[in-house]
Design a protein with these regions (language model features):
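Alpha-helical multi-pass membrane segments and their bilayer interfacial helix-loop junctions
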Residues: 1-259
Length: 259
């Protein structure tokens, strides 16, 4: 709590990311891992989120949403990397980090669509700051390695989810004359991959995160799309119908408990 307060109050003092917090966070993560405490693991995972939010507030325009996406991808990927290890302590700690990272990724994806859409036709930069993008790519690498080591298909879909979210930044850079449907499609595809990942691994937090992200992206698209109210309503109805159909199909793959 003290480290989070220390880091967040720097928002009013300097604009540079507070990298010293990362050292404190790593120390806390090491203690949570050594204690093998699930409560401590949750606290450590939650503590990372305010730092990324405070750091994102320093960024101009839509870049703040991209920073949040990169932070969520790093937290999610690092968690999956630890969850793929054979040790019970590391696996349990990684599962907690991955759960919080997945939910953060879903929320950040919706914010990215809404915020980037507002700045699409302006001269504001639409992309990831290099240092933040490095964190997002690291999260993707961790997930790919975890999928290769564990041979779990759910991890592969999780890697696809992170990759599609990161690719969305490249699609925003194109700045088409009309609507950036490619960027929208990448974000929706990323959230579907997140849902499928949770279903294949029977991890409900990941399933919930995927549906939260899907709803957030649809809401962001509805907000960002320019045009008549009728056109937005038609898109929202179409997206809602697709979500119902998709949930019906995927629900058949959910693990069933014994009666």
């Amino acid at each position: 709590v003290a480290a989070c307060t220390w880091s967040c109050t720097r928002v009013f003092e300097v604009r540079d990311p507070h990298y010293a917090f990362a050292l404190v966070w790593l120390l806390a993560a090491g203690l949570a891992l050594a204690w093998n405490s699930r409560v401590a693991a949750h606290l450590v995972a939650i503590a990372a989120i305010p730092w990324w939010i405070a750091t994102a507030l320093h960024q101009p325009g839509a870049e703040s949403s991209f920073v949040l996406v990169d932070g969520a991808a790093l937290l999610f990927g690092a968690g999956l990397g630890l969850a793929a290890l054979s040790g019970e302590r590391a696996s349990s700690f990684g599962a907690v980090l991955a759960a919080h990272g997945a939910i953060s990724l879903g929320v950040a994806a919706g914010l990215e669509v809404a915020m980037a859409g507002d700045f699409l036709h302006s001269s504001v930069s639409l992309g990831h700051p290099p240092w933040a993008l490095a964190g997002g790519v690291a999260g993707l690498v961790f997930t790919v390695v975890a999928a290769f080591v564990s041979r779990r298909p759910g991890f592969g879909y999780a890697a696809g989810s992170i990759g599609l979210v990161l690719l969305g930044a490249a699609a925003w850079q194109v700045r088409p004359g009309g609507e950036p449907w490619l960027a929208y499609a990448l974000q929706l595809g990323a959230m579907v991959c997140l849902v499928v990942s949770g279903i294949l691994d029977a991890v409900r937090p990941r399933i919930v995160a995927g549906w939260i992200g899907f709803a957030g992206v649809v809401a962001g698209i509805t907000w960002a799309v320019k045009g008549s109210l009728l056109g937005r309503s038609a898109f929202l109805a179409l997206a809602g119908g697709a979500a119902i159909a998709l949930s019906t199909v995927l629900n058949r793959r959910l693990p069933r408990g014994r009666p």
